[in-house]
């Protein structure tokens, strides 16, 4: 349905319609309110939803107020109130170098996630410090205290020569050393003496390590998870004596770190 003209009230057809100032006009009816000069979309100026030309556009005027004692007092009072409020706000925010952030659901979720990550890291560090440098998978088997260890190590050192397996690796030195031979005036240097370690024997009981272990004393051996322990002899419920097949080292090892094959 075609609208009516805001000036003459007649129907405005699309071919002569001007849409401006929230109203519809005929092109001929869209003129200045004062001088009746026809206007267009480029040279009109609107005031109170009425078109004006540049020359007759209403100018805004300001009312002069006399500087009476009462007005001066109100002006001074307003300035004092502004200064008081400014100082109050300044003192209240003094020393605060942060801006207030709204506690939105997204920020609450991020804060909760950070707290969970901090708790996880704390528990990881706590478990590592409790397990020590030789921690394996899961909970580390508890070691006997130093008093229990010293109670059976002393008699073991006295009986150790009687319990060394016959197949334990020892350092052997060849009984016969090559003699330097001389040919005329030249003397051939003797070959260097080599110290060989005999391979561990395959007899006796065989165990497999289920945890990593670092030797805490000279009479103990170190091994890794998965190493094979051969020539194993049971000392008591907590300790064994055997040879690590991978390294050839022989000594004491905790019984709860290995399992029978």
Curated annotation (Swiss-Prot):
Residue stretches of biased makeup (Basic and acidic residues): 121-130
GO cellular component: cell cortex; cytoskeleton; focal adhesion
N-acetylmethionine: residues bearing it: 1
Region (Disordered): 111-186
Sorted UniProt keywords: Acetylation, Actin-binding, Cytoplasm, Cytoskeleton, Ion transport, LIM domain, Metal-binding, Methylation, Phosphoprotein, Repeat, SH3 domain, Transport, Zinc
Gene Ontology biological process terms, A to Z: monoatomic ion transport
Domain (SH3): residue spans on this chain: 202-261
An annotated Gene Ontology molecular function: metal ion binding
Positions bearing Phosphoserine: 99, 118, 134, 146
Keyword Ribosomal protein attributed: no
Positions carrying N6-methyllysine: 75
Localization per Swiss-Prot or TrEMBL: Cytoplasm, Cell cortex; Cytoplasm, Cytoskeleton
Modified residues annotated as Phosphothreonine in this record: 68, 104
Listed SMART domains: LIM (SM00132), NEBU (SM00227), SH3 (SM00326)
Task of the protein: Plays an important role in the regulation of dynamic actin-based, cytoskeletal activities. Agonist-dependent changes in LASP1 phosphorylation may also serve to regulate actin-associated ion transport activities, not only in the parietal cell but also in certain other F-actin-rich secretory epithelial cell types.
Name of this chain's protein: LIM and SH3 domain protein 1
């Amino acid at each position: 349905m075609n609208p009516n003209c805001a000036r003459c009230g007649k129907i405005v057809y699309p071919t002569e319609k001007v849409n401006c100032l929230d109203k519809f006009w005929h092109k001929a009816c869209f003129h200045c309110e004062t001088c009746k000069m026809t206007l267009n979309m480029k040279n009109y100026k609107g005031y109170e939803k009425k078109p004006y030309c540049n020359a007759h556009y209403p100018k805004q005027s300001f009312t002069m107020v006399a500087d009476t004692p009462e007005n001066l007092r109100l002006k001074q009072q307003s300035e004092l109130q502004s200064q008081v409020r400014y100082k109050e706000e300044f003192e209240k925010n003094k020393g605060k170098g942060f801006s207030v952030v709204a506690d939105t659901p997204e920020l609450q979720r991020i804060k909760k996630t950070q707290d969970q990550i901090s708790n996880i890291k704390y528990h990881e560090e706590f478990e590592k410090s409790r397990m020590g440098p030789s921690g394996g998978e899961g909970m580390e088997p508890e070691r006997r205290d130093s008093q229990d260890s010293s109670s059976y190590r002393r008699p073991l050192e006295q009986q150790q020569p009687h319990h060394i397996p016959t197949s334990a690796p020892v350092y052997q030195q060849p009984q016969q050393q090559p003699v330097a031979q001389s040919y005329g005036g030249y003397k051939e240097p003797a070959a260097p003496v080599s110290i060989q370690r005999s391979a561990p024997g395959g007899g006796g009981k065989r165990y497999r390590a289920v945890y990593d272990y670092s030797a805490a004393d000279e009479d103990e051996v170190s091994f890794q998870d998965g190493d094979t322990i051969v020539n194993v002899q049971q000392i008591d419920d907590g300790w064994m004596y055997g040879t690590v097949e991978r390294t050839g080292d022989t000594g004491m090892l905790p019984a709860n770190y290995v399992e029978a094959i």
